[in-house]
Amino acid sequence: PLTFEDVMNVIDLEQPEGVIVALGGQTAIGLASLLSQAGVRIFGSSSGSIELAEDRQLFEKAMEEIQIPMPKGKGVFDVASALAVAKEITYPVLVRPSFVLGGRMMHLVYDEESLKQKVEEALHLDSRYPVLIDKYILGQECEVDAICDGSDVFIPGIMEHIERTGVHSGDSMSVYPPYSLKDEVIATIVEQTRKIGLKLQMIGLYNIQFIIDANKQVYVIEVNPRSSRTVPFLAKATGLPIANLATKVMLGYSLKQLGYVGLYPNRKRWYVKSPTFSFSKISGMDVVLSPEMKSTGEAIGYDYSLNRALYKSLRASGVRVSNYGTVLATIADADKQAALPLIKRFYDLGFNIEATKGTALFLKENGIKTRIKKKISEGSDEILESIKKGYVTYVINTASERDSLMDGKIIRRAAIDNNVAVFTCLDTVLVLLNVLEEMTMRISLIDEE
């Protein structure tokens, strides 16, 4: 691991004029304060600016001063305070420790019992820092990578996530340029990005994640005062040398000198980033998407057609895309109405539909011919046998009730072990269907402009 002592040993040996921490991820910027105290010059955002972005109370105060909305929430140091905050802002809430990477131990909870358990786990991880309790807002998520020189801001691009809030940004499919955001929402995001960069006195790269709710209200989830994992994707999509530009800014160049200010114009092609997972190599790991990041890589697909770009990205990430076969559906009660039109589209495409009893009866009531499969918890292994023998093309599983969690986990694991595509988020299923309905098209070559 990157430690202060190791870095200081290199600095003592090399005697550099200064160091850049913003390109080294969360661990690197975590060393900024110690390095500054040791007299090391930090190129880019100062340790004070980094702290302003990272410290919950300081950041909330800064956002309030520039009138930028955030989801309601608070940091707590005990379970009783967590329960009080959750009662005030109402469930569901997001629970996460401070200063963690990849959404580690971040959970979406719906009741007091789950909240107690998750807060205790987070406090056990590190009781020196508060556990953050935030109101969960269901909405469209997007993120921005930007460069600030202290006076101006340059935004290479805005990326819109396929999956709605509740899935970690690193596990979401991401599209550039945005495919559904209205002009007024984009204008708000650009203005908020500018105001945040100047308020926090960012020098170089920073990343902001936003939520857009059903009323088109834009909220800031968090600001990362560093280069994000999305920079390589955005650099590829825009053709801009983003890291190079940011480094020049950190070394003292102004954005106006470099000729880049404001929002960079969108390119004509669509670029889609899909996460890649290593579930088949990590035995026992659950594949369900959640606020905690599980992906280990990413793939890109691009084309002048959005659906073709989505197809290429899915295929590049290892998803077997087939326009015939059998869909196995086990859907939570809360998701049944949203899943119905999606399952209907599979049925209309000619897929066989199989489901556990509750889901099957619901689908039959709505005119979809469905074969009932017994649950594993009922002592049957017919679902597992069907998956193992290659009869199932796709598994759609959104089960979240406690009594069906174990069934769902076993089904998801069996699918992964037998190279069957698993979808735990209906937003991703919608993308797959859009692709399947265009499967007869000729896929264009990945060419250069």
Describe each region flagged by the PLM.
Residues 1-18, 26-29, 41-44, 66, ...:
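ATP-dependent carboxylate activation and anion-phosphoryl transfer catalytic cores
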Residues 21-23, 42-45, 72-75, 95, ...:
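General beta-strand structural signal in soluble alpha/beta enzymes
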Residues 78, 289, 293-308, 312-315, ...:
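C-terminal accessory/binding modules appended to enzymatic or scaffolding proteins
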